[in-house]
Amino acid sequence: MNKTAKLIDHTLLKPGATEFEIKTLCAEALKYGFASVCVNPFWVKLAASELEGSDVKVCTVIGFPLGANTTEAKVFEAKNALENGAQELDMVINIGAVKSGLYELAYHDIKLIRDLGKNFVLKVILETTLLTDAEKIKVCELSACAEADFVKTSTGFAGGGATIEDVKLMKANISSGMQVKASGGVRDLETLTKMVEAGASRIGTSSSIKIIESL
């Protein structure tokens, strides 16, 4: 059970999440041994306090969910999150820049956050449902050049989620030290297993407990 739990970012990103729900999320992560909790930036400080001294990481999102912030805003948001206790950052690429062929801009979004340090895990969210396969490959290459740790399929807010095909494509187009996070629509053990078999080594889901208790 614990091995599967360690694949999961226990996620609560809905805008109406309450303090009680965040505390419950953290307690669940401690109980089941999830890799991290993934919360919105406002809740990072609380999550860090609740998880202090444990091996459950605090993950938050940057430029979420649209990715359309300026690079400067994303860098500030990332720096602020790290100061508040975040250990993993899931940042959304500038999707419009990628689709416009403005790859240098998209690269700098990632690189300037990476330049904040190597003491945190950086995951780059592609939002695969909005990209062509060629664009997905390009973002994987940019992420590798910027020394990101992961590429991630989706925010879960754009109408599409992780697919087996996308996970395989992403895995095939990242550097050997990088990993893939599948997120969006992973709600049961069968889907999680398929994502892992396709090459994902981290899963983002709000159905974590349902999955673990089905083992």
Swiss-Prot record:
Signal peptide positions (record): none
A GO cellular-component term linked to this record: cytoplasm
Location relative to the cell: Cytoplasm
InterPro entries attached to this UniProt entry: Aldolase_TIM, DeoC, DeoC/FbaB/LacD_aldolase, DeoC_typeI
Plastid listed as a keyword: no
Cross-referenced Pfam families: DeoC
Chemical reaction(s) catalysed: 2-deoxy-D-ribose 5-phosphate = D-glyceraldehyde 3-phosphate + acetaldehyde
UniProt main location, coarse: cytoplasm
GO molecular function, one term: deoxyribose-phosphate aldolase activity
Function: Catalyzes a reversible aldol reaction between acetaldehyde and D-glyceraldehyde 3-phosphate to generate 2-deoxy-D-ribose 5-phosphate.
Protein name (Swiss-Prot/TrEMBL): Deoxyribose-phosphate aldolase
